[in-house]
């Protein structure tokens, strides 16, 4: 095991320079698979945030003085550097977040690159329009950068979700202060270095690491921040929204989920159960859109439970660095305690624990894939986001019953529908309260389609052209022709 003096020290990245935190404090970053220290990370302060905001504000003019086509080329160079350093980025993400290296190589890093390339293509396509109002005036609109953006990034997909915020903001001409999650900062810091190498001017992309209660709160309160974008828990999202109200910052929130996966009796059960297992056990269930509620029609309920349990037992839990591993650890000891606490809650509420529900090994935050049967809609394990590999299988009687149960939580991020009846799947998709509905598939996202929810799942959308609106302000211009 490395001692603290052996660990690499990661400073803040502000205005193109690596800076020690003003407090001089560093925290130990932990590998969740081994519980061993892997790095020392700067603990930023409110003063460090202020320095970063001033750097970002000054860099706005520099970034917007660069022709849009050249900004696009810079972002494409960054995408190329990410691709050239894919192995390094994947190794950092796997080490820091406990994610299986095979999944990170296949999805996380390529998806982040795809997002950046997509928005690089937007740089010279952010247009206003001429709006005919009266014959003696030329009236038109412009879209201008919203300004300085604070992006607060979660720990479950650090680089991928970080890029959902960074790429469109940069394409729109904004500058950023990125606050990665305290426990998964490494890929954000490396991205900041690659951005400078690609030609992103100093101050355009700043990385300030540290605690949410310090760095996050300072970003929320700072009057120099024009826009906040956050992915995380509803409780933190509420606090951010309340804090941002003090100076009327624009806010986008992507919060929790308790997504329902509806399996009707005419569904292809092989495909449905395979996708249901992936939908809850992928990334150890630490996914906002995880299909944690599996709603099965009474005619196929027992078969769905049996098949799902078999798939849960077949999941290869273990070392994230091993190519055959399909599920790694939970992110932290605290998250493991939360998940195991919900297992006990489910049992005490009367649900049937079919498989899993225990810690794996003595080192690392591993928990067996877990399946509960005979779950009632009102139970806490059916209503509350667990953020772990815990599936609740709920029985329904008919289409109306399924929709009632699916819509019966505070969340509305995503849902899945499995049926061979074309009329049914369209009816159910229409009636489900969800930002995304998958039909006879589950879990896909793409930067070209909007992503987000409502209620405790947040508000606003990321991805696609909607994100361009998130990071720009419209301006109306009147020119009197006859003057």
What residue spans do the PLM features occupy?
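Short, well-ordered beta-strand elements within core beta-sheets of diverse protein domains
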Residues: 37-44, 59-65, 151, 261-264, ...
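ALDH superfamily catalytic-core signature
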Residues: 235-376, 439
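Structural signal for hydrophobic packing residues in well-ordered secondary-structure cores
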Residues: 60, 64, 79-86, 90, ...
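Residue-level signal for inorganic ion chemistry
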Residues: 35, 71, 93, 116, ...
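Conserved C-terminal structural/oligomerization subdomain of aldehyde/semialdehyde dehydrogenase
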Residues: 36-40, 225, 262, 316, ...
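Terminal low-complexity tails and localization/encapsulation signals of metabolic enzymes
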Residues: 1-40, 73, 77, 126-152, ...
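Glycine-rich loop-to-alpha-helix module at the N-terminal edge of alpha/beta enzyme cores
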Residues: 36-126
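Rossmann-like NAD(P) dinucleotide-binding subdomain of oxidoreductase/dehydrogenase enzymes
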Residues: 127-271, 396
């Amino acid at each position: 095991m490395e001692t603290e003096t052996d660990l690499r020290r990661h400073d803040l990245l502000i205005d193109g320079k690596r800076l020690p935190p003003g407090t001089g404090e560093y925290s130990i970053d932990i590998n969740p698979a081994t519980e061993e220290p892997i790095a020392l990370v700067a603990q930023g302060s409110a003063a460090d945030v202020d320095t970063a905001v001033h750097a970002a504000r000054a860099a706005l003019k520099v970034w917007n003085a660069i022709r849009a086509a050249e900004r696009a080329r810079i972002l494409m160079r960054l995408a190329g550097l990410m691709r050239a350093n894919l192995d390094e980025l994947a190794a950092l993400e796997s080490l820091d977040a406990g994610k299986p290296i095979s999944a990170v190589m296949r999805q996380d890093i390529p998806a982040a690159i795809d997002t950046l390339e997509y928005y690089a293509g937007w740089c010279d396509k952010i247009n206003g329009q001429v709006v005919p109002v009266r014959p003696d005036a030329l009236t038109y609109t412009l879209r201008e950068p919203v300004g300085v953006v604070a992006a607060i990034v979660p720990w479950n997909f650090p680089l991928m979700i970080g890029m959902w915020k960074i790429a469109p903001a940069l394409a729109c001409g904004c500058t950023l202060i990125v606050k990665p999650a305290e426990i998964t900062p490494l890929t954000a810091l490396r991205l900041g270095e690659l951005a400078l190498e690609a030609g992103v001017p100093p101050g355009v992309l700043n990385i300030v690491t540290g605690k949410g209660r310090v760095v996050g709160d300072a970003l929320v309160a700072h009057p120099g921040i024009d826009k906040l974008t956050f992915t995380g828990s509803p409780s933190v999202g509420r606090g951010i929204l309340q804090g941002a109200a003090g100076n009327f910052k624009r806010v986008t929130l992507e919060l929790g989920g308790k997504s329902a996966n509806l399996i009707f009796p005419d569904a292809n059960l092989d495909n449905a159960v395979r996708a249901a297992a992936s939908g809850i056990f992928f990334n150890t269930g630490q996914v906002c859109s995880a299909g944690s509620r599996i709603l099965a029609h009474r005619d196929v309920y027992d078969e769905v439970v049996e098949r799902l349990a078999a798939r849960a037992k077949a999941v290869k839990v273990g070392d994230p660095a091993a190519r055959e591993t399909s599920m790694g650890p939970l992110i932290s000891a605290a998250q493991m305690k939360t998940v195991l606490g919900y297992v006990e809650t489910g049992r005490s509420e009367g649900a049937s624990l079919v498989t899993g529900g225990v810690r794996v090994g003595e080192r690392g935050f591993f928990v067996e894939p877990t399946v509960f049967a005979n779950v009632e809609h009102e139970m806490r394990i059916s209503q509350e986001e667990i953020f772990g590999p815990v599936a609740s299988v709920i029985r329904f009687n008919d289409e109306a019953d399924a929709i009632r149960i699916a819509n019966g939580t505070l969340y509305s991020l995503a849902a899945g529908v499995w049926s061979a009846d074309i009329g049914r799947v369209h009816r159910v998709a229409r009636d489900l309260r969800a930002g995304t509905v998958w039909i006879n598939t589950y879990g896909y996202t793409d930067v070209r389609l909007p992503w987000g929810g409502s209620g405790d799942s947040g508000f606003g959308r990321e991805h696609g052209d909607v994100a361009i609106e998130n990071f720009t302000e419209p301006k109306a211009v009147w020119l009197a022709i006859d003057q």
